[in-house]
């Protein structure tokens, strides 16, 4: 999400994140990345904190992710990991069933 020349921010599944979440995380990023925490770990931590703040479960954050070196590498590492918003239920199953999600789980994730 940190690359201005593309990257994951261009994925339909991430619509809105580059403007909303990035703006919220920018002061933290400027202060702590990369010396204290990677961008990837910061985003994971932020997602877990947001989940708990909204009444969801507390999720343990595991640290140690390594940031992609450029926008091309960040895109290549994510291809096929997130669903395309304009595809149907078979596409969602292709993405989530291999990760152990049931149809019920997929519906909950999809909102």
What kind of feature is each model-predicted range?
Residues 1-111:
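Soluble secreted/lumenal catalytic domains
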